[in-house]
């Protein structure tokens, strides 16, 4: 079984982990609703993508929910 000969210093450990950081999330403002959304994703507020309606909202009544 392989065992390290010397203790890895904090500097070496942190340099090895330097590429593991998460990148920033690119968030844009939706031109129609003004809400924040991820690029190339459907707007969660009104269901539009690229200025086209792609998802219609289903209106649930109290009878359907119960």
From Swiss-Prot:
Q: Which SUPFAM superfamilies match?
A: Zn-binding ribosomal proteins
Which parts of the chain are coiled coil?
Answer: none
Gene Ontology MF term list: structural constituent of ribosome
GO cellular component terms, alphabetically, are: large ribosomal subunit
List the keywords (alphabetical). Ribonucleoprotein, Ribosomal protein
Q: Which InterPro entries match?
A: Ribosomal_bL32, Ribosomal_bL32_bact, Ribosomal_zn-bd
Gene3D superfamilies attached to this UniProt entry: Single helix bin (1.20.5.640)
Task: State the Gene Ontology BP annotations.
Answer: translation
Family affiliation: Belongs to the bacterial ribosomal protein bL32 family.
- The entry's protein name is Large ribosomal subunit protein bL32
Name the lineage.
Bacteria, Pseudomonadati, Pseudomonadota, Alphaproteobacteria, Rickettsiales
Q: What's the name of its gene?
A: rpmF
């Amino acid at each position: 079984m392989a065992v390290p000969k010397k203790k890895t210093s904090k500097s070496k450990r942190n340099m090895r982990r330097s590429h593991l950081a998460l990148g920033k999330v690119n968030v844009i403002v939706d031109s129609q609703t003004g809400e924040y959304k991820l690029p190339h994703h459907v707007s969660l507020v009104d269901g539009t993508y690229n200025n086209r309606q792609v998802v219609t909202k289903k209106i649930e009544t109290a009878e359907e929910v119960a």
